[in-house]
């Protein structure tokens, strides 16, 4: 509503007719959302990102939810986009969690129809890598492992070294491999990931499982070259 005065927008927003999503971007509240006076992000995210003229994909727990592996419905909505960061006020819309990377791995995105058009989200393998790499946005590695446990039946890392690994870090692959191997006992998937990793890089160095704790005196996992400096516990599904 670019031609509306701010006073008019405030009035119809307070009446529950429109919902303020972003500075200058409002969504008309459909009748079936009128009681809550808000609209879920999946309803407007594609239109919002078009308005911002930025590429995106639905990521982390919300992508996992689309894959049927969220365990619990996420309280926030994670959107992956590219730098530079958008100036989004948390007070304007605190349901959106913005995560940024250098480029969007379009070859590893899936699409589906929503109420208002088409939305884009990460495929299972990219989702798995993202929830490990950006675990600070979802509550840590134990939460990531719980999601991975539900996602394993959809994971297929054959050929990942050709292109997918270029969108993440070696450390992320190591941590994901360790979790699949030692925490989730998903040996077949872990073996495939390991073969892809060793074909991608000839050698890799030891890293801590988490950067939030010291690695002194931590046990070593020789296969994935991990300092096991934290305990990962998955929730019961």
Q: Which functions belong to the PLM regions below?
A:
Residues 109-237:
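Hydrophobic alpha-helical interaction segments
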Residues 7-16:
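Basic amphipathic alpha-helical segments that dock to polyanions
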Residues 15, 81, 185-188:
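Bulky hydrophobic/aromatic packing residues
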Residues 1-6:
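Short, small-residue-biased leader/transition segments that mark boundaries at the very start
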Residues 17-104:
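Short gly/ser-rich loop at a beta-strand->alpha-helix junction or flexible surface loop bordering the NTP-binding
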């Amino acid at each position: 509503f670019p031609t509306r005065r701010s006073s008019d927008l405030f009035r119809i927003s307070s009446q529950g007719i429109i919902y303020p999503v972003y500075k200058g971007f409002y969504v008309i509240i459909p009748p079936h959302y009128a009681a809550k006076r808000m609209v879920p992000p999946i309803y407007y995210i594609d239109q919002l990102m078009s308005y911002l003229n930025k590429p995106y994909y639905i990521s982390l727990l919300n992508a996992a939810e689309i894959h049927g592996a969220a365990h619990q419905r996420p309280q926030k909505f994670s959107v992956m986009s590219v730098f530079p960061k958008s100036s989004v006020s948390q007070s304007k819309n605190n349901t959106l969690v913005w995560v940024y990377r250098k480029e969007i791995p379009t070859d590893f995105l899936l699409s589906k129809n929503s109420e208002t058009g088409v939305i884009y989200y990460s495929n299972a393998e990219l989702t798995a890598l993202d929830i490990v790499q950006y675990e600070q946005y979802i509550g840590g590695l134990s939460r990531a492992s719980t999601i991975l446990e539900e996602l394993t039946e959809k994971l297929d890392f054959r050929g990942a070294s050709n292109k997918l690994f270029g969108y993440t870090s070696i450390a992320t692959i190591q941590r994901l491999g360790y979790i699949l191997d030692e925490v989730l006992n998903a040996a077949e998937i872990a073996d495939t990931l390991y073969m892809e990793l060793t074909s991608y890089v000839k050698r890799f160095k030891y890293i801590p499982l988490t950067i939030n704790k010291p690695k002194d005196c931590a046990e070593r996992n020789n296969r994935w070259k991990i300092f096991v400096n934290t305990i990962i516990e998955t929730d019961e599904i």
